[in-house]
Amino acid sequence: KLIKEIKYEGLATIEFLVDFKKADFRFIECNARLQVEHTVTEAVLDLDLVKAQILIASGKTLKQLKLEQKDIVEPKGFAVQTRVNMEVIDSKGNTKPSGGKFSAFDLPSGPGVRADSYGYSGYQTNPSFDSLIAKIITHSSEDNFKQALKRNYRSLCELKIEGVTTNLDLLKNILSDKSFKNNNFHSQFLDQNIKTLLLKNNHTDLSDITRSIKKETLKRGKIEDLDPLAVLDHGKSGGGFVEDSENILKLENEELEEG
């Protein structure tokens, strides 16, 4: 109703404060753009909002894009986004941008994991731009908030950034906080718990393990043959790249009894 009233055409983000105990909400503001958290909406609704925004700007209607309210499905599962910033955090939680050159940079991946970033190993940061370097979005299609958190925490442990100071440890501490995992938090959660959340914790570093797995996967998938049809022989005797392994699944034709 608000968008129709102002005759707005395009994609906008409307923010509310929600009181779950009273099942009540209050309007905050309307932004005539995507918000950085749009990836959460995309995950739970299986939409590409950036694509939709461009198509609407080019003249397409919501009806043509099948994005009218009646076409929007119920949110599926939970999605969590963490924002990795290049910043230094003092004991009171105040932040200031950090900078430098990335000596190592490797993003997490896997089912239900999305990583948006412009970083790469060797990248020299620019203080003229925002300190946000990566967004890690994880989705659990099940109605399980803890699973989405667990997946995001693991992804942060797989993320490798060296050469600049980031808020990675703070993010890991938040996701592993007992109250937070039990969905018991509010808009003042960070302010009230900042001292505890800034303490050093021994989080498992999975970045080297993950990178080794990626390299091994690429190595095993390499087909050393100029024949463009060599891929059809991959894993077969006489093919361009063969390696005996108990992990190779062998399929054989076998007659089955009726029924």
Describe each region flagged by the PLM.
Residues 1-246, 252-259:
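ATP-dependent carboxylate activation and anion-phosphoryl transfer catalytic cores
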